[in-house]
Amino acid sequence: NIVSTLKEATIKDLDDNFISLDNFEYKKDTNIFKSVGKILLKDKNQNSYEFSQIYINEKKKEIIGSNAKAFLNQEDFKIDKKNKPRIFSNTINLKENDTKFIKSAFTICNYRENDKCPPWELLASEIRHNKKNKTVYYDNAIIKIYDIPIFYLPFLAHPDPSVKRRSGFLNPSFSDTKNLGASINLPYFWAIDND
C-alpha cells in the first residue's frame, strides 16, 4: 500500500496545495506522505514554502518540514504593498489553526542596496501563529538591525496583521538618518472600548 516515485513530481492535495518535489513516498494505510530533497509547497493563499524534508499527515492535517523558508504573499501578512514577509526556520509545523516555526528568523525587508528598509530581522527560538485567536507569539526574541542584536525579549506577542483593532503593540517602524543614526519606533494602541 505504498505509492512512491524517485522522479520529479507535482501533486495537488485536497486543500488546493501544490507540492513540487524530487521524490516522495505515500503510505495509503496511514495517510502519511514524506519526501527528502528539494521541495516547494504553494498553498491556496499563494504563500510558498521551501523544504529539504517534509512529512504530511493527512488524517491530522499536519505538515512538518525541515530547513524551511516561508515566503508569505497573503495580504493578511503584509503591512503594506512594498513588504515581503518571510520566515526562515530549522523546523516548521503547519496545522489547521496553529503554525510553529522552531529556531526562526523573520523579516519584511528585501536586503537590497537600494531598499529603503534597513536590514532587520527578528530571531526567535519559537514563533507560533494561533490562527483561531489571531495572535503571533515569540519565545526568546532578539531584534537585530544590520546584524547587531538590539533588543532581547524572553516573550513577545502581538495580533496578526489581519486583526483590525485590539490593544497591543503596533507594527514597528525603523529609520536610519545621518544625523540621528538608526532608530526604532514601537507604538502601542490602547482600545478603550470594544466598538
Describe the role of every protein-language-model region.
Residues 1-195:
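Structural signature for solvent-exposed beta-strand/loop edge elements and short helix-capping sites
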